[in-house]
Amino acid sequence: MNCLERTDAATPVGPSAGQLKRQGPLSWQEARARANMYGFLSNLFLIPPSQELIKWAGEDDRSHELSAAFGEKAAAELKAFAEDFRLQRDTATVIQDYWDLFRIPTGRYVAPFEDVYRGTPLDGKKSRGPLLGKHAIAVIRTYREAGAVLDERRKELPTHIGIEFAFMRFLCEQEASALGRSGGHLRRFGGNRKPREDGRYLELQGRFLGDHLNRWFPRLAQEICSNSQSRFYPGWISIAEAFLLWDTAALSNPRAYRNP
Protein backbone atom coordinates (compact mmCIF):
# COMPACT_ATOMS: atom_id res chain seq x y z
CA MET A 1 0.00 0.00 0.00
CA ASN A 2 1.24 3.47 -0.86
CA CYS A 3 1.73 5.70 2.18
CA LEU A 4 2.44 8.85 0.20
CA GLU A 5 -0.58 9.41 -1.99
CA ARG A 6 -1.31 13.12 -1.94
CA THR A 7 -4.28 14.38 0.05
CA ASP A 8 -5.85 17.43 -1.54
CA ALA A 9 -7.62 19.08 1.38
CA ALA A 10 -7.26 22.84 0.99
CA THR A 11 -7.95 23.38 4.69
CA PRO A 12 -6.89 21.34 7.72
CA VAL A 13 -9.28 18.61 8.74
CA GLY A 14 -7.88 17.75 12.13
CA PRO A 15 -9.32 16.64 15.45
CA SER A 16 -12.11 18.73 16.88
CA ALA A 17 -11.86 20.18 20.36
CA GLY A 18 -13.98 17.32 21.64
CA GLN A 19 -11.74 14.72 20.05
CA LEU A 20 -8.68 16.33 21.60
CA LYS A 21 -10.20 15.74 25.04
CA ARG A 22 -10.31 11.98 24.91
CA GLN A 23 -12.55 10.40 27.50
CA GLY A 24 -12.33 6.75 26.52
CA PRO A 25 -10.76 4.24 24.15
CA LEU A 26 -9.58 5.16 20.69
CA SER A 27 -12.27 4.99 18.04
CA TRP A 28 -12.02 4.66 14.29
CA GLN A 29 -13.44 8.19 13.90
CA GLU A 30 -10.60 9.60 15.97
CA ALA A 31 -8.04 7.60 14.00
CA ARG A 32 -9.48 9.06 10.77
CA ALA A 33 -9.33 12.58 12.19
CA ARG A 34 -5.71 12.09 13.21
CA ALA A 35 -4.92 10.70 9.75
CA ASN A 36 -6.44 13.83 8.21
CA MET A 37 -4.33 16.06 10.43
CA TYR A 38 -1.11 14.22 9.63
CA GLY A 39 -2.04 14.32 5.94
CA PHE A 40 -2.49 18.07 6.14
CA LEU A 41 0.87 18.51 7.86
CA SER A 42 2.50 16.32 5.22
CA ASN A 43 1.13 18.48 2.40
CA LEU A 44 2.20 21.62 4.24
CA PHE A 45 5.83 20.66 3.60
CA LEU A 46 5.52 18.74 0.33
CA ILE A 47 3.49 21.07 -1.89
CA PRO A 48 3.17 24.86 -2.23
CA PRO A 49 0.22 26.27 -0.28
CA SER A 50 -2.89 26.98 -2.32
CA GLN A 51 -4.43 30.43 -2.36
CA GLU A 52 -7.51 28.83 -0.77
CA LEU A 53 -5.51 27.66 2.24
CA ILE A 54 -3.75 30.99 2.64
CA LYS A 55 -7.09 32.81 2.44
CA TRP A 56 -8.63 30.31 4.90
CA ALA A 57 -5.86 30.98 7.42
CA GLY A 58 -6.33 34.72 6.97
CA GLU A 59 -10.02 34.73 7.91
CA ASP A 60 -10.74 36.22 11.33
CA ASP A 61 -13.00 33.47 12.64
CA ARG A 62 -10.46 30.70 11.95
CA SER A 63 -8.41 31.63 15.01
CA HIS A 64 -11.40 30.79 17.22
CA GLU A 65 -11.70 27.34 15.65
CA LEU A 66 -7.99 26.67 16.01
CA SER A 67 -7.92 27.99 19.58
CA ALA A 68 -10.76 25.65 20.52
CA ALA A 69 -8.95 22.65 19.05
CA PHE A 70 -5.32 23.37 19.89
CA GLY A 71 -5.31 26.10 22.55
CA GLU A 72 -4.95 29.88 22.41
CA LYS A 73 -1.17 29.81 22.68
CA ALA A 74 -0.80 27.46 19.72
CA ALA A 75 -3.19 29.54 17.61
CA ALA A 76 -1.71 32.93 18.53
CA GLU A 77 0.66 33.18 15.57
CA LEU A 78 -2.05 32.41 13.01
CA LYS A 79 -4.34 34.86 14.79
CA ALA A 80 -1.70 37.54 14.28
CA PHE A 81 -1.38 36.48 10.63
CA ALA A 82 -5.15 36.92 10.18
CA GLU A 83 -5.24 40.32 11.90
CA ASP A 84 -2.88 41.84 9.32
CA PHE A 85 -3.93 39.70 6.36
CA ARG A 86 -3.86 41.09 2.81
CA LEU A 87 -4.69 38.43 0.22
CA GLN A 88 -2.51 39.51 -2.70
CA ARG A 89 0.47 40.57 -0.61
CA ASP A 90 0.45 37.62 1.76
CA THR A 91 -0.23 35.00 -0.90
CA ALA A 92 2.94 36.02 -2.74
CA THR A 93 4.98 36.14 0.47
CA VAL A 94 3.77 32.77 1.76
CA ILE A 95 4.38 30.99 -1.54
CA GLN A 96 7.87 32.48 -1.73
CA ASP A 97 8.43 31.32 1.85
CA TYR A 98 7.58 27.77 0.81
CA TRP A 99 10.19 27.73 -1.95
CA ASP A 100 12.86 29.48 0.11
CA LEU A 101 12.38 27.34 3.22
CA PHE A 102 11.76 23.90 1.78
CA ARG A 103 12.90 23.72 -1.84
CA ILE A 104 15.67 26.09 -2.87
CA PRO A 105 18.94 25.42 -1.00
CA THR A 106 20.00 29.04 -0.56
CA GLY A 107 20.11 31.44 2.38
CA ARG A 108 16.80 30.64 4.10
CA TYR A 109 16.64 26.94 3.27
CA VAL A 110 16.02 24.84 6.40
CA ALA A 111 16.96 21.38 5.01
CA PRO A 112 13.83 19.55 6.31
CA PHE A 113 15.44 16.13 6.80
CA GLU A 114 15.77 14.14 10.00
CA ASP A 115 19.38 13.19 9.21
CA VAL A 116 20.41 16.84 9.12
CA TYR A 117 19.07 17.65 12.58
CA ARG A 118 20.33 14.52 14.31
CA GLY A 119 24.04 14.90 13.68
CA THR A 120 26.86 13.68 15.89
CA PRO A 121 27.58 15.83 18.99
CA LEU A 122 30.84 17.79 18.68
CA ASP A 123 32.16 19.48 21.83
CA GLY A 124 28.69 19.41 23.35
CA LYS A 125 27.04 20.83 20.25
CA LYS A 126 25.05 19.10 17.56
CA SER A 127 26.55 19.05 14.09
CA ARG A 128 24.45 18.62 10.98
CA GLY A 129 24.43 14.98 9.99
CA PRO A 130 24.82 13.39 6.55
CA LEU A 131 21.82 12.52 4.40
CA LEU A 132 20.98 8.83 4.07
CA GLY A 133 22.91 7.90 7.19
CA LYS A 134 21.93 5.68 10.11
CA HIS A 135 18.74 7.60 10.83
CA ALA A 136 17.53 7.15 7.26
CA ILE A 137 18.23 3.43 7.52
CA ALA A 138 16.18 3.22 10.72
CA VAL A 139 13.30 5.17 9.15
CA ILE A 140 13.24 2.97 6.05
CA ARG A 141 13.19 -0.16 8.21
CA THR A 142 10.19 1.17 10.10
CA TYR A 143 8.38 1.95 6.84
CA ARG A 144 8.97 -1.60 5.68
CA GLU A 145 7.91 -3.06 9.03
CA ALA A 146 4.59 -1.26 8.71
CA GLY A 147 4.07 -2.33 5.09
CA ALA A 148 4.34 1.22 3.76
CA VAL A 149 5.68 1.75 0.25
CA LEU A 150 7.26 5.02 -0.85
CA ASP A 151 5.59 6.64 -3.84
CA GLU A 152 8.05 6.39 -6.73
CA ARG A 153 6.63 9.60 -8.19
CA ARG A 154 7.93 11.57 -5.22
CA LYS A 155 11.56 12.65 -5.26
CA GLU A 156 11.88 13.48 -1.56
CA LEU A 157 14.21 11.45 0.64
CA PRO A 158 12.58 9.12 3.21
CA THR A 159 13.57 11.38 6.12
CA HIS A 160 11.92 14.51 4.67
CA ILE A 161 9.50 15.93 7.25
CA GLY A 162 6.62 15.70 4.78
CA ILE A 163 7.33 12.01 4.19
CA GLU A 164 7.51 11.24 7.91
CA PHE A 165 4.17 12.98 8.47
CA ALA A 166 2.75 11.02 5.53
CA PHE A 167 3.90 7.82 7.22
CA MET A 168 2.03 8.80 10.39
CA ARG A 169 -1.04 9.42 8.24
CA PHE A 170 -0.62 5.95 6.75
CA LEU A 171 -0.39 4.36 10.22
CA CYS A 172 -3.51 6.20 11.41
CA GLU A 173 -5.41 5.12 8.28
CA GLN A 174 -4.37 1.52 8.86
CA GLU A 175 -5.42 1.80 12.50
CA ALA A 176 -8.80 3.22 11.48
CA SER A 177 -9.38 0.38 9.03
CA ALA A 178 -8.44 -2.21 11.65
CA LEU A 179 -10.67 -0.54 14.23
CA GLY A 180 -13.55 -0.57 11.77
CA ARG A 181 -13.12 -4.30 11.31
CA SER A 182 -13.00 -4.86 15.08
CA GLY A 183 -16.16 -2.96 15.92
CA GLY A 184 -14.92 0.60 16.22
CA HIS A 185 -12.90 0.64 19.46
CA LEU A 186 -9.36 -0.37 20.26
CA ARG A 187 -8.68 -3.45 22.32
CA ARG A 188 -5.07 -4.39 22.74
CA PHE A 189 -5.73 -8.13 22.69
CA GLY A 190 -8.19 -10.39 20.92
CA GLY A 191 -10.01 -13.29 22.50
CA ASN A 192 -6.98 -15.54 22.15
CA ARG A 193 -4.79 -12.91 23.89
CA LYS A 194 -2.78 -12.30 20.76
CA PRO A 195 -2.00 -8.65 19.93
CA ARG A 196 -4.66 -7.24 17.64
CA GLU A 197 -3.95 -5.53 14.34
CA ASP A 198 -5.22 -2.15 15.51
CA GLY A 199 -2.95 -2.22 18.57
CA ARG A 200 0.04 -2.96 16.34
CA TYR A 201 -0.47 0.22 14.32
CA LEU A 202 -0.98 2.23 17.48
CA GLU A 203 2.30 0.89 18.88
CA LEU A 204 4.10 1.80 15.65
CA GLN A 205 2.74 5.35 15.86
CA GLY A 206 4.01 5.84 19.40
CA ARG A 207 7.38 4.35 18.55
CA PHE A 208 7.84 6.47 15.43
CA LEU A 209 6.99 9.65 17.32
CA GLY A 210 9.38 8.77 20.14
CA ASP A 211 12.24 7.47 18.00
CA HIS A 212 12.02 9.96 15.16
CA LEU A 213 9.61 12.91 14.84
CA ASN A 214 9.84 14.15 18.42
CA ARG A 215 13.62 13.87 18.32
CA TRP A 216 14.11 16.44 15.58
CA PHE A 217 10.93 18.33 14.68
CA PRO A 218 11.41 20.91 17.50
CA ARG A 219 14.79 21.93 16.04
CA LEU A 220 13.34 22.13 12.53
CA ALA A 221 10.49 24.22 13.92
CA GLN A 222 12.97 26.72 15.36
CA GLU A 223 14.71 27.04 12.01
CA ILE A 224 11.43 27.59 10.17
CA CYS A 225 10.30 30.26 12.61
CA SER A 226 13.67 32.03 12.41
CA ASN A 227 13.75 32.10 8.61
CA SER A 228 10.11 32.76 7.64
CA GLN A 229 9.15 36.08 6.08
CA SER A 230 5.50 35.80 7.15
CA ARG A 231 3.62 34.41 10.15
CA PHE A 232 1.96 31.69 8.06
CA TYR A 233 4.48 28.89 8.52
CA PRO A 234 5.38 29.78 12.13
CA GLY A 235 1.64 29.71 12.80
CA TRP A 236 1.20 26.21 11.44
CA ILE A 237 4.39 25.12 13.21
CA SER A 238 2.76 26.11 16.52
CA ILE A 239 -0.32 24.08 15.62
CA ALA A 240 1.85 21.10 14.61
CA GLU A 241 3.80 21.24 17.87
CA ALA A 242 0.59 21.34 19.90
CA PHE A 243 -0.84 18.44 17.94
CA LEU A 244 2.31 16.32 18.32
CA LEU A 245 2.38 17.03 22.05
CA TRP A 246 -1.25 15.98 22.38
CA ASP A 247 -0.87 12.91 20.20
CA THR A 248 2.27 11.73 22.00
CA ALA A 249 0.56 12.06 25.38
CA ALA A 250 -2.57 10.34 24.10
CA LEU A 251 -0.65 7.40 22.66
CA SER A 252 1.19 6.89 25.94
CA ASN A 253 -2.06 6.95 27.94
CA PRO A 254 -2.91 3.45 29.19
CA ARG A 255 -6.61 4.34 28.92
CA ALA A 256 -6.19 4.16 25.16
CA TYR A 257 -5.86 0.40 25.58
CA ARG A 258 -8.81 0.03 27.91
CA ASN A 259 -11.63 -2.25 26.85
CA PRO A 260 -14.86 -0.28 26.32
Q: Where are these predicted regions, by residue range?
A:
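Surface/interface-facing alpha-helical segments and adjacent flexible terminal/loop regions used
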Residues: 1-260
